[in-house]
Amino acid sequence: LALECFRIPHFYRAFYVYKYATGLSAAIALSQRVLTGGADELADYLGFLQGGCSEDPLDLLRNAGVDMEQPQAVDTALAHFGHLVDQLDDLL
């Protein structure tokens, strides 16, 4: 039991949890583009999916309209989270 913490990769793998946050930020930014955009944004998203592993993930995301090297994707995710918190607050 004393070494139980070594079984959980969240504690010892560099950037393990960071991957969740960046993936979620990218997904929210992509979905917001599709839901609020038009045919071009949908085509960008489908192109992202069709890209598979053909390019670097950052390049695929950038081509789909989400630049993970800029703060907008994280800002979009934080705004979405804030909206969800407001909805929860209204329910409570």
Summary of predicted features, one role per range:
Residues 1-92:
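C-terminal, non-catalytic "cap/extension" segments appended to globular domains
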